[in-house]
């Protein structure tokens, strides 16, 4: 056999070896990790920024289970020790409750990676983002919006302006469904220090002060049950100011129904990741949580949807929306210039004390 033929056959053999190896690599069954999350643009953003990259980096087949929040499925899984889900995306109030009930694994905060800029995790995450059983993913806020061009050059800028009917007349739209958000906003706009708000609301005097502040709007108050309705009120003139969810401001802008925004005293909450207690894939689940709450992953989500990264270091990595080309930074609660006076809603406090306060709120509401 000639040397040339030997080389050719050797080369063919090498190619076949590579092809066979590739076949077995592609056909092998990857381990599955199932993450329960939400449908719609948020779940789509997580798929693009977290689930696919984690699967590629760690050789996992990430399955997505859609749910509507709450704890019923988690309670059944942990109670029966039959686990359909390995990681869950929670609204923070549910994560707090699940942690208190012993339904979630403890998460070692010291194991979380530093931010992309080197900031240690314990200094990088926003307040309330890291707890005994959860790690924050995104921040969303109730903010103040007002009808554009209504006040000319005298642009409202602060939460106090929401209550200033003399300078900025017109109807005010507030959330009807709960005292939460309304009482905090009233006290902050009345000049109370943020650190004093929840101590004050433990007392009749503090609640009275909040309700008196809200009562200064009597005769100008209208109510909403859905934040999208508040945007509609601003657009059609039923309201001059409204408290709204920041995501609805983004949606309105995409449909050319934009409103003007005041970020002062935004009231923020979080979505977080947690791991069901006793699940068989705890190690992989924890690995996913660390990956998904890294700076790059959180920035990727914020490039798709208007929810602020729960880590400050992620902001510099946020890009324009890949499909729409929209600059996302103006819509993010945690963006520079937006977060300086942000107030963290204390969901654990509301779980403990809300049942005592809500009846008082309903009585006051009926009097308006």
Language-model regions, residue ranges each:
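Early extracytoplasmic/lumenal segment of secretory-pathway proteins
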Residues: 23-98
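Extracytoplasmic ligand-binding site segments that recognize negatively charged/polar headgroups
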Residues: 40-47, 84-85, 90-231
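A ligand-binding cleft/hinge motif common to bilobed small-molecule-binding domains
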Residues: 94-97, 241-258
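Periplasmic-binding protein-like
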Residues: 140, 207-216, 253-279, 323
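A bilobed periplasmic-binding-protein/Venus flytrap-type ligand-binding module shared by bacterial periplasmic
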Residues: 143-150, 187-188, 270-284, 300-304
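Conserved C-terminal helix/tail region of periplasmic/extracytoplasmic solute-binding proteins
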Residues: 336-368
């Amino acid at each position: 056999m000639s040397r040339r033929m030997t080389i050719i056959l050797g080369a063919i053999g090498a190619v076949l070896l590579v092809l066979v190896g590739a076949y077995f690599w592609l056909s092998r069954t990857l381990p599955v990790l199932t993450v329960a999350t939400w449908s719609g643009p948020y779940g789509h953003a997580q798929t693009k920024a977290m689930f696919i990259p984690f699967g590629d980096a760690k050789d996992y087949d990430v399955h997505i289970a859609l749910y509507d929040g709450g704890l019923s499925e988690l309670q059944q899984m942990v109670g029966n020790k039959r686990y359909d889900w390995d990681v869950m995306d929670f609204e923070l109030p549910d994560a707090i409750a699940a942690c208190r009930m012993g339904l979630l694994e403890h998460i070692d905060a010291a194991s979380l990676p530093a931010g992309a800029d080197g900031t240690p995790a314990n200094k990088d995450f926003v307040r309330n983002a890291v707890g005994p059983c959860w790690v924050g993913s995104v921040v969303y806020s109730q903010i103040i919006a007002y009808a554009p061009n209504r006040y000319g050059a005298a642009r409202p800028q602060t939460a106090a302006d929401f209550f200033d009917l003399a300078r900025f007349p017109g109807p005010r739209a507030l959330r009807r469904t709960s005292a939460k958000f309304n009482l905090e906003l009233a006290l902050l706009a009345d000049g109370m220090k943020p650190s004093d708000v929840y101590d004050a609301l433990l007392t009749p005097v503090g609640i009275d002060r909040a309700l008196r502040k809200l009562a200064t709007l009597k005769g100008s108050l209208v109510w909403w049950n859905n934040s999208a309705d508040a945007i509609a009120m601003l657009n059609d003139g039923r309201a001059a100011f409204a408290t709204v969810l920041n995501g609805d401001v983004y949606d309105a802008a995409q449909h050319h129904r934009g409103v003007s925004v005041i970020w002062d005293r935004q009231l923020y909450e979080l979505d977080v990741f947690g791991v069901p207690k006793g699940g068989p894939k705890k190690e992989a689940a924890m690995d996913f949580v660390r990956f998904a709450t890294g700076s790059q992953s959180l920035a990727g989500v914020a490039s798709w949807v208007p929810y602020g990264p729960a880590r400050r270091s992620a902001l510099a990595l946020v890009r324009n929306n890949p499909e729409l080309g929209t600059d996302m930074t103006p819509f993010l609660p945690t963006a520079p210039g937006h977060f300086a006076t942000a107030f963290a809603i204390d969901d654990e406090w509301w779980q403990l004390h809300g049942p005592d306060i809500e009846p008082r709120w309903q009585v006051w509401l009926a009097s308006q």
